[in-house]
């Protein structure tokens, strides 16, 4: 006998919501959301909540992954970047003084001038390559770290999140929007990492605002420095761009210091969130 339309609707609605129950992980005992197939803490496979589970659509699921090691590596890279930028600023100052000396005829002979210029180019070139390698590696790892900590918030079942892990990273590469969207995403990550269950009421530290301020300022000055360096050909032009390059390196140091503080704090928040009972998060 065929079931009535009303009965069919009741069966379907039960599959979608009514029959799904929260469950404890058989391995670590943490309470998990009904839709989870693996434990958000230990990653163990979860038993089906009901026979209707297999009929339900499978949503995208994320597993909490401890960011401690990633955070540690990123902090070391930021420290390396701070050191490299500081050394580069000193080298840039030495080059600036060399150019002024060349302009003012401060060398006794052309041989002395050529020797000083070659030593400067070698030193500055090696330091520049080191800075570039550290910067590229830091950018890649920073993007991976942002994706990881954002993904963890979704794995914890944090309610009301506006940014996906992909867009928490992606907004950095969207012109114009990258002036504020990445900061909004980082604010969300900061607040939600501090209190996943009720993050909307959490405040942020001034450190986060200062990080973004110096990030924007250093990015603008670095862009100006690059454009001026590419156009500079005459000796006077090379001398003029020197102070801008030095300022750019100093601002990069300041920006990296605040970035380090932000990364360290969010990493600490997520470590505490992982150690707490996730049953309270989903309550």
Segments predicted by a language model, with ranges:
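Short, flexible, mixed-charge glycine/proline-rich loop motifs
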Residues: 16-20, 30-33
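Membrane-interface extramembranous regions at the lipid-water interface
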Residues: 24, 34, 40-121, 138-171, ...
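Hydrophobic alpha-helical transmembrane segments
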Residues: 120-136, 243-255
């Amino acid at each position: 006998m065929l079931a009535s339309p009303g009965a069919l609707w009741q069966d379907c609605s039960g599959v979608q919501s009514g029959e799904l129950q929260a469950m404890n992980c058989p391995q670590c005992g943490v309470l998990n959301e009904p839709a989870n197939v693996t434990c958000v803490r230990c990653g163990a496979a979860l038993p089906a909540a009901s026979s209707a589970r297999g009929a339900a659509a499978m949503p995208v699921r994320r597993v909490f992954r401890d960011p401690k090691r990633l955070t540690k590596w990123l902090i070391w890279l930021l420290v390396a970047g701070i050191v490299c930028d500081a050394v580069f600023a000193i080298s840039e100052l030495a080059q600036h003084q060399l150019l002024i000396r060349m302009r003012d005829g401060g060398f006794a002979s052309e041989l002395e001038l050529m020797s000083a210029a070659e030593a400067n180019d070698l030193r500055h070139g090696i330091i520049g390559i080191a800075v570039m390698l550290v910067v590229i590696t830091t950018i890649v790892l920073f993007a991976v770290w942002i994706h990881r900590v954002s993904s963890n918030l979704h794995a914890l079942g944090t309610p009301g999140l506006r940014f996906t892990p992909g867009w928490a990273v992606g907004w950095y590469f969207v012109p114009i929007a990258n002036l504020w969207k990445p900061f909004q995403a980082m604010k969300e990550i900061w607040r939600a990492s501090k209190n996943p269950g009720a993050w909307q009421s959490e405040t942020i530290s001034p450190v986060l605002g200062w990080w973004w301020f110096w990030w924007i300022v250093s990015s603008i000055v670095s862009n100006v420095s690059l454009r001026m360096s590419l156009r500079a050909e005459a000796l006077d032009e090379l001398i003029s761009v020197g102070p801008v390059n030095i300022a750019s390196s100093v601002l990069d140091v300041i920006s990296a210091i605040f970035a380090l503080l932000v990364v360290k704090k969010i990493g600490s928040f997520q470590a505490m969130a992982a150690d707490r009972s996730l049953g309270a998060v989903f309550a």
